[in-house]
Structure formats: C-alpha cells, structure tokens
C-alpha cells in the first residue's frame, strides 16, 4: 500500500486451487488513526501486522489478526465455516489514562461489548506472537509481547514492560504450566524504568528479570543440553545477544554463551540428532551445544559445513520454516534454494518414542504463526527431556514421556476442517472396550501413549480423568489439561456424545 493509503482486505483462498473464496474489509482500516498515533509520521508502524490461528473456544480454529504494536493495538478474531468469514470480536487497545482507566474495549458480533480496566495491549507488542493456553482454562490465549490477550478479546494480563524482539512460550520447567520468555527493548518494572531486559514469567507471576545494557535483538530459551538438564535440574536454559553467558531459569550463569563462527546461536532451536535436547539453528548453520564444552559439532556432511540454501530476514537469519513435517518428532528445515525450496531432515536414529509434535495443538498453531514478523522457534505445550521420561514399576527409565508431563493428545480422522469435534463427557461406570465402540475405558496405562493405547473408531485416542472439574472436555486434543495432579490415580471411562 502506498503512503496515501488505500483499501485493505482479508481473503480466504482455497488451498488446493488458489481460488479466492471470500474477501472482507480488513478491520480496522489504517485511517482509524492518524499516522503519528501509530507511532511515527510516515505510516510504517500502522502496517505492523501479526497473525495467528488459535482455538479460542477450545474446539474450532479462529484466525486472529492484529494491527500495531508500538502504540495503539487492534486485534480481530474471525471464524471460517467453509463459506463465510465472520468477525467474532474486535479488541481496541489504548493508553489506560486515555479513557479513565479503560485500556481495552472489545466489541462482539452480537452487538455487546466488554471493557478492561488498567490492562491494555497498547505499546506491549513484540515482533512476533505466540499461542498457548497459559491459564489452563481449556481455551487458547494470544501472547502479545508483554501482555496476554484472552480468548474473548479482553486482556488477561499486562506487565507494562513494553516492546521486544523475541519471545518463547512452553512448559520449560516441566511443572505443567506455560512459561513465557521475552527479550525487551524498553519498559518498566515496579515503576522503575528498565531500558533493556529479558524476563521469564507465567501469565500471572514473575520468575526472573535480568537487566541488559543494550538492544536485545535476539534471545532464546529451551532444553539445549539434555544431559546437563537431567544432572543439574536446570531443565531449560536461556541466553541473548545482550549477555555474556547462558543462564538457568533463576537467572544464574551456568556456562559460556554458544559461539560458532561469530554467531551466538540465539536464533532458533530444532530437534535433530535423536536425543531429547534441541540443537541450535542460525541461518543455515546447525550445531549441537554443550554447557561444559561449548559447541560440540556442526551438522551437515563430513566437512561440517552449513546447509546449502538461502536464509531470510537479513540479520535474523531465518529458514523458511522449521517443523515436524514427517511425524518422527524430529524437525525438518526448509530453505530457499535457487527458484525452489529444499527440505532437510535428520537421518540420525533415535531411541525415543514421542508422539508426533504436530498432534500437540500448541505446536501446530506455532507452525502457523512461525513466519509472522521475526520468525521464532515453535514449542510444544509440554516439556521434552530426559527429566520427563516415564519409569516402570522397578524404577527403570523408559523411552517415552511420563503421563504427568504431557497434556491431552489425540489423533482423529480429519474428514472436514469445519466439522466441530465431539464433546467428551466423563462417566463413572466402567465399560467394556470393543472395536468401533462409542464408549471406552481410559486408564493409566494408556496415558503415556504405549502400545496398549485404546483406539476409538480405529483412529481416535483420548486421555481424560474422573475429576468432576473435567466432566466436559471439548475438542479431542484441542483443549489440553495437566495430568500431573492425577498421577498414580486410576482414570475412568468416558463416552463420546
């Protein structure tokens, strides 16, 4: 769009034919504010769009489009039923002092509205967005930099630390809760101005805040040395371009920052070599890191060279995509090459049996938002690492994740993207499992994904609980809940309605 503006649209295209199926006006239009109110006088910041797919009702996918993140922020959610693209709500975010403390106003499709007091997305956005169920209510939230947008368009939480370049969201410490790591350019904490910082938090509480001396263009957090994680109890580590070391979740330095040919490798993490720690990807360089010895090796052929192909986004050095495309829980790397693309995949065997990562809806949603803004690594909703492996009755470690460390995972025959998933309701009467039955028994032996896992209609697997609080679990895996509180307890039968 030129500097003089013009119409903007949101269009649904047929994925098989490329045909436009429906087009609506983009909401809101750029003209809703003057250029200076977007954060500059030449219109660039009015065009800061972010986008995501999220299961806002726990069952159906919604498209969430946002506009602006340096100052005013608008977020709109849409549903698509195969024919009509309909707006669910529009969230308008302003300075809290502008409207008597009301920082967020949400207007719904039915004409109703809702306000937030002293909470706003205003000036809190990052160059990326994440999707996760951070409050374990069964509905996806949108992690929007230093604030979290709830499934209904209101602001769930807001810390006021402002804009940043990088964010990562997962259960980094295997406690069944989502942690949020973010690198900030500017903001404040307890009324103290902090120009630059990294922090780790849950949606409603701080874990660690580390001040920095300059702009933090990149930062990352993950389990990158699984042997160290298991032996030390530091299950995930973080580092950034603004610090001189690698740190545990408490902010304590535990090792030297990775360095490979001048790169600190704080860009991307991928599962590649078959152990449960992630390798580091910066541009087309793929390396393995050790806390004790530093970078151990560069992967790709006998010359330890970079993967052939071109990278994207200049200094951000992104692949086109990283994802578990082929289902072996390791991740493929997609790079531009000439006038096409190359997909690189690991040929290294693994001893571990993990569910395909794309069956975790948080990970699947991450693949959808990965290319938005500054690309960020996708993460599962659960911790992956040796510290989370199951044990048998004799205390021997097994080669799959313990049920207490994983959320609901389900496979189902996806005959139609637009068909609502069945509702799962708990029942107290045990039943006999038969092929193609509508009722089935779920017990502790099925929760970890073993060979005894029961199949419904030859394709659907589900884990549920006898807890009254979980009597209505929707979405067959699109809603996730923590099983750790039920560890050691017998789970009961359930009925598909």
Predicted segments with their positions:
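A short beta-strand element within beta-rich, extracytoplasmic domains
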Residues: 481, 490-497
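A general secondary-structure signal for short beta-strands and their flanking turns/coil
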Residues: 46, 474-476, 493
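Flexible, small-residue-rich N-terminal segments that precede or flank a structured functional core
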Residues: 422-483
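Acidic glycine-/aspartate-rich tracts in secreted/extracellular proteins
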Residues: 485-487
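Beta-propeller-forming repeat regions
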Residues: 1-422
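Short beta-strand/loop motifs in extracellular/secreted proteins, especially
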Residues: 73, 477, 489-492
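Exposed beta-strand and adjacent loop surfaces of beta-rich binding modules
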Residues: 7, 430, 493
């Amino acid at each position: 769009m030129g500097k003089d503006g013009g119409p903007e649209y949101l269009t649904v295209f047929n994925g098989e034919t490329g045909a436009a199926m429906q087009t609506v006006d983009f909401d809101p239009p750029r003209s809703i504010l003057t250029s200076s109110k977007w954060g500059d006088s030449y219109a660039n910041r009015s065009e800061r769009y972010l986008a995501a797919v999220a299961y806002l009702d726990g069952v159906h996918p919604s498209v969430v489009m946002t506009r602006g993140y340096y100052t005013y922020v608008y977020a709109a959610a849409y549903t698509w039923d195969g024919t009509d693209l309909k707006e669910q709500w529009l969230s308008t975010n302003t300075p809290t002092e502008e409207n008597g403390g009301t920082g967020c106003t949400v207007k719904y499709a039915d004409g109703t509205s809702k306000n937030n007091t002293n909470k706003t997305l205003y000036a809190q956005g990052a160059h990326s967005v994440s999707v996760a169920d951070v409050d374990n209510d069964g509905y996806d939230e949108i992690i929007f930099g230093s604030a979290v947008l709830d499934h209904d368009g209101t602001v769930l939480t807001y810390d006021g630390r402002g804009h940043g370049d990088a964010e990562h969201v997962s259960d980094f410490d295997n406690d069944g809760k989502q942690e949020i790591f973010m690198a900030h350019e500017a903001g404040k904490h307890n009324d103290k101005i902090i120009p630059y910082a990294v922090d780790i938090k849950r949606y409603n509480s701080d874990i660690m805040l580390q001040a920095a001396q300059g702009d933090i263009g990149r930062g990352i957090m993950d389990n990158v040395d699984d042997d160290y994680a298991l032996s030390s109890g530091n299950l995930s580590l973080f580092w950034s371009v603004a610090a001189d070391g690698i740190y545990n979740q408490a902010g304590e330095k535990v090792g030297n920052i990775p360095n490979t040919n001048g790169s600190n490798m704080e860009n991307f993490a991928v599962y590649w070599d078959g152990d449960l720690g992630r390798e580091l990807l910066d541009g087309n360089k793929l390396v393995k890191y050790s806390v004790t010895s530093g970078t151990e090796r560069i992967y790709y052929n006998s010359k330890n060279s970079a993967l052939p192909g071109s990278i994207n986004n200049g200094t951000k050095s992104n692949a086109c995509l990283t994802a578990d495309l082929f289902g072996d829980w390791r991740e493929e790397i997609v790079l531009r090459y000439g006038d096409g693309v190359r997909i690189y995949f690991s040929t290294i065997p693994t001893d571990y049996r993990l569910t395909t990562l794309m069956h975790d809806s948080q990970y699947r949603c991450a693949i959808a938002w990965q290319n938005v803004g500054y690309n960020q690594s996708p993460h599962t909703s659960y911790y992956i690492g040796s510290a989370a492996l199951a044990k048998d009755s004799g205390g021997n470690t097994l080669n799959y994740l313990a049920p207490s460390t994983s959320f609901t995972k389900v496979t189902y025959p996806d005959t139609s993207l637009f068909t609502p998933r069945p509702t799962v309701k708990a029942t107290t009467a045990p039943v006999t499992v038969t092929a193609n039955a509508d009722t089935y028994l779920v017990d502790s032996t099925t929760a970890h994904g073993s060979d005894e896992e029961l199949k419904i209609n030859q394709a659907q697997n589900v884990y549920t609980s006898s807890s009254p609080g979980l009597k209505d679990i929707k979405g067959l895996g699109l809603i996730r809940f923590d099983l750790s509180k039920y560890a050691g307890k017998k789970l009961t039968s359930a009925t598909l309605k």
